[in-house]
């Protein structure tokens, strides 16, 4: 299973639906996050003026067994195509941001479902980890 930044932010922030996301992570034998999404997650936590939480990101990923995966050339191409087709400014209702395209790409290249929060990915052809 591929994990988008939005899923971890929802868990840390205690958003509605966070329990479902936690349970999906606990059930998953192999969870991965794209390296740019890891950076995005750290930046979001830091921006929220909660440095204590930003320091816990690595521990949280370890607790859930989420591996950070480097971006390869295939993923980069798929991410670029996703931004073209689904990105902000494309006119598509998904309105993916740049970080979203890396989660999308890793899920597409690996064929794994994507764990996310929100409705942006529901407007794409990605397979969700939770319905």
UniProtKB/Swiss-Prot annotation:
PINc domain boundaries: 1-125
UniProtKB keywords: Hydrolase, Magnesium, Metal-binding, Nuclease, Toxin-antitoxin system
InterPro entries in the record: PIN-like_dom_sf, PIN_dom, Type_II_TA_system_RNase, VapC_family
Origin superkingdom: Bacteria
Residues given in the record as Mg(2+) binding sites: 4, 100
A single MF term (Gene Ontology): magnesium ion binding
Enzyme class, UniProt record, top EC level: hydrolase
Listed name of the protein: VapC ribonuclease Mb2780c
Source organism of the structure: Mycobacterium bovis (strain ATCC BAA-935 / AF2122/97)
């Amino acid at each position: 299973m591929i994990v988008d930044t939005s899923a971890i932010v929802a868990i840390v922030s205690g958003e509605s639906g966070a329990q479902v996301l936690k349970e999906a992570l606990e059930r998953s034998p192999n969870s991965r996050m794209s390296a740019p999404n890891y950076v995005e997650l750290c930046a979001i936590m830091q921006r929220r003026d909660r440095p204590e939480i930003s320091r816990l990101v690595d521990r949280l990923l370890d607790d859930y067994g989420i591996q950070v995966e480097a971006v390869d050339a295939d993923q980069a191409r798929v991410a670029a195509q996703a931004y073209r087709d689904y990105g902000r400014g494309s006119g598509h209702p998904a309105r993916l941001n740049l970080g979203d395209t890396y989660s999308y790409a890793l899920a597409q290249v690996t064929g794994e479902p994507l764990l996310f929060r929100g409705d942006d990915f529901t407007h794409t052809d990605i397979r969700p980890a939770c319905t």
